[in-house]
Amino acid sequence: MKYHWPLMGEIITENQRMDLAKFILSTTRYTQGPQVKEFEDQWSKWLGTKYSVFVTSGSTANYVLVAAIKERYNLKDGDKVLVPANTWVTSISPIIQNNLTPIFYDISLDNFGPDEGSIEKIKQKHSEIKFAFVTHLLGLPANLNSIKKYYPEI
């Protein structure tokens, strides 16, 4: 018996398509417009924060996050950051783009989080890690206990 499970389907209605077409034809500005500002303000209010910044993608969000951490904690070019060896390039690129040095750790096959033996070996060579960029791979929450154990200050 054959089964057919579609991987996607039509989720945008005809009315939504027409609304989008009207919007595209009504302006030449598609980013950082008044609707984005209004949404940022409402989002900030809901979060209880002073500011929010909307970006184009998760990749850009990672870049902005690393840049903000570098500025906030006065990190210097070349400072070392723990990153998983098994991740997406968009988790590593922001480290390099911000002139920081990625130090790769292995993951545990039990939970795809940091492998304790790997973190222990890294600690022996690199005591001066400034922060850890952790990927919660495949939607599984990474166990951070090994990072906390060997780098309690980060």
Question: Across the structure, where does each feature detected by a protein language model lie?
Answer:
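Alpha-helical structural signal in soluble globular domains
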Residues: 42, 52, 94, 98, ...
